[in-house]
Amino acid sequence: MKNISPHLSIYKFPITAISSITNRASGMYITLIGLSSSFLCFTNENTKNKFYNFYYNLNDYQKTFLNSLILYPFGYHFSGGLRHLIWDSFPHLLTNSKVATSSKFLFVVSIIPTLLLEEKIKNKI
């Protein structure tokens, strides 16, 4: 049987689609973190101590990497929410080229809230 359309690898995946998928994935990730954290609150002390000991036995670089891995989706989702508020207020910004540019910008700008949260955690611990 002959293929009707060419293989999907020839198509360029648009940054706007990647941004949309990442926004949905970060929302699911945040939900998972929330559920995991609440589950941890209801476990016995031995389980909690294992998690705490694991974290506190990491060196500073490992803690920073782990914190960033956990916090980046929060920063991304927050920044994406701000972007949608801006679009709601200024609909003329919703052109294809501006949406693509803002999607690229969003991936970079999300680092700022991640670093701010990371610094807050470092100061608390």
Protein language model annotation of sequence segments:
Residues M1-I125:
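Membrane-embedded alpha-helical bundles that constitute the cytochrome b-like, heme-associated redox core
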